[in-house]
Amino acid sequence: VKWFQLDADAPDDPKIRAVVYALGVEGFGGLVGLWCHIAKHGRRPGQGIDSRGAPFPLDDLVAATGLPASKFNELVEICTRSGHFRRDVWQMYRGVWIPAMERRADRYSRKLASSSQLPIDWAGQP
């Protein structure tokens, strides 16, 4: 999946506000970078797992945020505490699973299927 939904009201979400409060806009940027990485490389929407079903390497997740490791760890703590990331998946596998991203992708896919629409390819590729 190479897309995800980002609403204009995202900064007002309490889970996102907690990130901004603790880490500032740098933390928000890191979170968006992580969302992009998971959307682009994840096997399933919202799940930071590769094509074999293995969690992404921790170094790749840290690099995707652009944050130093200490701030990445703080970001993960905030997101698992708030429920933005599934805590159980992080604790067991050091994997990132974002339920909201998964739900939104499912809704979008159902909407496309029911209306027989396909995503627009802005690159002009068939």
Go through each PLM region and give its residues.
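Alpha-helix N-cap/helix-initiation sites
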Residues: 24-28, 51, 69-73
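Short recognition helix of helix-turn-helix/winged-helix DNA-binding domains
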Residues: 1-45
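A Lys/Arg-rich helix-loop hairpin that forms a DNA/phosphate-binding surface
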Residues: 43-55
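Winged-helix/helix-turn-helix nucleic-acid-interaction surface
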Residues: 1-6, 10, 55-126
